């Protein structure tokens, strides 16, 4: 129904200001927001209305004061006003029955209505049916709780309320509530989409408010308000549960921060780089146990703790167990050589010489604010101590070509001295290359380049190529030079892969960068036809992920390596990440191992990265709640997207966030966050908006009587969806952490207010 033109004016006399607080205009379109106008203002503005409501201080109930309908001649006519309460008490404001509210004058006119407005008014007075529906839903939730009573009793007392709320959430999701949501939205009573953290208490509050409207007795009303205060206490407690669990798992937030930043580091991260990462805003460091060994992990942890203590910035450590992940085997390493190449223009002329860092092998990597094109370590400290800016070093590269390095800058730092040298021609430098300092008559002693890393081996796959995956490591392909044929070979040591796949099933590599179709399979080899790769081919190296989303694969929960690594993690880390969680059996096995090691305070982060893990998440959480260990969930979007499909990732991510919100479990949002910025120094537009969704909030919709206390419980009624955002390691990770910190903690309310100021001609609307 639409109203082409309706003018309504309401003027309140001065003697009515002590009674009437607000006038509310309800629009003909149910989805339109109601406009509340302070009394004492004369409104002469054309609006599309169906009814006018007034709220009085002496009575919390809202009543319909007037509405207008057309007569046969399409002339405006004031109709009898109806109370909006469930008892449908009428307040007639015609000429004969207006003495009680004589201080309110209503003027209304209407020109055209397409449908009969009376039907719309009847729809607006549907609170009785809403109350019945809410009570039915309330009973359904209680029945579900009783049905799962035996399961809830097994949960640790710390998680008992959270487990109950999770059961209520699941019971609510089983119902078709679209019509009820629509009705609640029209009445501005409750938003079922934003009550995940305190479902039963929210429904109780809504029911109490509707029951309150049915009663006109002051004593009854006071009794109900007392009950509401008790209900608010329950809402407050549940509202603070997520914040408490977040601090228990991730540690306290720094000043002015709203959520944590986690950064993955490897053995290449120096102490100075870790310090820069912490200063930029990171509060959690992640170590991936799939790479390295206990000695490497110990050194990383030492650097982290040293930096944290020096900066007086608390930092938690998360160690991810490798889990039963399928990965490509090792290719034969390439030569220990590095290419130094200056930047050239389209015609091949050098426009910028290559920047090379020179230092002693024990000095560590260059300072984080430098981004050299190559790093060369020298074995002779005396040779370095005699170098000065302007000196020239001559050498013969791996091809026998004569090349030179010119020292342009010198740096002194706590671990030694380093230099930046410029090279104007392409050179290939290998371990053992001799550097000679150029002199007019004196021949200076030479120094050798050492510890040049081996070239990372890879195979380049194109669409149509055949790839053979072998179980036998002796079948490794030597990739020192790319083969001319389209047949490639790589290994995988996991027997699960060869026992699970069948011809015709898809297979993905490196987080979905390469896709193929299995042509044949045996107990020792799998032949794959590549169906998706980059236009110029895509590199596939050692240790890259393998996913078989359509195959029926059976993994063990914790591998033998995981159990060995857990010994180290339990004594050195604050949190342990459990990779590729598939069902509650994996969690039961983990709980036994943690009980065996008596580590009740070790945080447990469940990584959801498989289809079965997503589908069984509620059961997994309830199983994890049987222990007292701090609990969290990581959304590993890389494997999850490959396993379940790119088109489903956004919806699955939202569902995980909703389930964890109902269980009061903090969420870590991970994989490819600001990846372009981390790797190349420049973010994409999509990455920036992607990160912004991590701080997206759900604004709860509540009755006025309850809103204040709920706001106190949920920090101005905003619930952060992700408690922590994770960045992977990369060349520009410090800059990425700083950018992420600014995006996550920007004052959006102040920013929106500043944006609106030029659009507002005056601070007075009327």
Label every model-predicted segment:
Residues 2-12, 21-24, 29, 40, ...:
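Non-catalytic helical/linker scaffolds that mediate oligomerization, partner binding
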């Amino acid at each position: 129904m639409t109203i082409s033109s309706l003018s309504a004016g309401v003027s309140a006399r001065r003697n009515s200001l002590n009674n009437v607080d607000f006038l509310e205009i309800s629009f003909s379109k149910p989805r339109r927001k109601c406009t509340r106008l302070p009394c004492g203002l004369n409104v002469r503005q054309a609006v599309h209305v169906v009814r006018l409501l007034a709220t009085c201080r002496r009575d919390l109930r809202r009543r319909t004061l007037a509405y207008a309908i057309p007569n046969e001649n399409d002339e405006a006519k004031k109709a009898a006003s109806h109370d909006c309460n469930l008892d449908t008490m009428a307040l007639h404001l015609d000429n004969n029955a207006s003495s009680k509210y004589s201080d309110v004058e209503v003027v209304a006119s209407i020109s055209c209505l397409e449908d009969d407005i009376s039907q719309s008014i009847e729809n607006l007075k549907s609170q009785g049916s809403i109350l019945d529906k809410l009570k039915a839903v309330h009973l359904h939730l209680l029945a579900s709780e009783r049905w799962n009573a035996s399961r809830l009793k097994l949960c640790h007392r710390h998680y008992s309320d959270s487990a109950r709320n999770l059961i209520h959430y699941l019971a609510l999701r089983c119902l078709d509530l679209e019509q009820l949501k629509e009705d609640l939205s029209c009445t501005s009573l409750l938003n079922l989409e934003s009550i995940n953290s305190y479902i039963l208490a929210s429904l109780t509050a809504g029911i109490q408010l509707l029951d309150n409207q049915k009663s006109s007795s002051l004593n009854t009303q006071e009794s109900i308000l007392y009950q509401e205060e008790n209900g608010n206490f329950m809402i407050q407690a549940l509202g603070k549960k997520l914040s408490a669990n977040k601090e228990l798992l991730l540690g306290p937030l720094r000043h002015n921060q709203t959520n944590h930043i986690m950064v993955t580091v490897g053995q290449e991260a120096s102490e100075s780089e870790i310090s820069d990462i912490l200063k930029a805003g990171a509060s959690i460091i992640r170590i991936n146990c799939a790479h390295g060994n206990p000695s490497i992990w110990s050194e990383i942890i030492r650097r982290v703790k040293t930096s944290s203590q020096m900066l007086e910035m608390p930092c938690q450590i998360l160690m991810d167990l490798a889990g039963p992940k399928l990965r490509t085997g090792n290719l034969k390493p390439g030569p220990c050589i590095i290419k130094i190449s200056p930047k050239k223009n389209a015609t091949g002329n050098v426009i910028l010489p290559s920047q090379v860092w020179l230092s002693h092998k024990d000095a560590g990597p260059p300072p984080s604010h430098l981004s050299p094109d190559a790093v060369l370590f020298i074995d002779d400290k005396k040779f370095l101590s005699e170098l000065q800016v302007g000196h020239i070093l001559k050498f013969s590269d791996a091809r026998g070509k004569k090349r030179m390095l010119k020292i342009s800058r010198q740096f002194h730092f706590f671990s030694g001295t380093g230099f930046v040298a410029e090279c104007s021609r392409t050179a290939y430098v290998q371990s053992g290359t001799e550097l000679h300092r150029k002199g007019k008559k004196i021949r200076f002693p030479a120094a050798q380049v050492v510890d040049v890393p081996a070239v990372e081996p890879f195979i380049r796959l194109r669409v149509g190529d055949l790839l053979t995956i072998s179980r036998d490591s002796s079948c490794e392909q030597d990739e020192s030079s790319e083969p001319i044929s389209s047949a490639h070979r790589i290994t995988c040591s996991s027997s699960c892969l060869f026992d699970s796949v069948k011809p015709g099933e898809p297979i993905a590599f490196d987080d979905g960068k390469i896709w193929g179709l299995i042509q044949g399979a045996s107990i020792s080899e799998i032949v794959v036809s590549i169906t998706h790769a980059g236009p110029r081919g895509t590199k596939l190296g050692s240790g890259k992920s393998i996913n078989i989303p359509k195959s029926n694969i059976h993994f063990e929960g914790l591998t033998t390596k995981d159990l060995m690594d857990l010994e180290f993690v339990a004594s050195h880390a604050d949190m342990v990440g459990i990779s590729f969680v598939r069902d509650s059996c994996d969690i039961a096995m983990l709980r036994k191992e943690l009980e065996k090691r008596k580590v009740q305070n070790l945080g447990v982060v469940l990584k959801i990265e498989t289809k079965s893990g997503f589908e069984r998440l509620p059961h997994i959480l309830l199983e994890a709640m049987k222990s007292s260990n701090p609990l969290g969930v990581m959304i590993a979007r890389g494997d999850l997207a490959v396993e379940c499909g790119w088109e489903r990732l956004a919806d699955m991510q939202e569902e995980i966030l909703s389930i964890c919100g109902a269980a009061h479990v903090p969420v870590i949002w991970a994989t490819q966050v600001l990846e372009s910025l981390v790797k190349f120094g420049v973010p994409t537009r999509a990455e920036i908006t992607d990160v912004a969704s991590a701080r997206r909030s759900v604004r709860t919709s509540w009755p006025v009587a309850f809103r204040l206390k709920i706001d106190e419980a949920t920090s101005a009624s905003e619930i952060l969806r992700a408690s922590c955002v994770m960045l992977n390691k990369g060349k520009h990770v410090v800059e990425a952490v700083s950018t992420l910190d600014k995006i996550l903690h920007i004052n959006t309310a102040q920013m929106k207010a500043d944006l609106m100021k030029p659009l507002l001609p005056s601070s007075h609307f009327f």
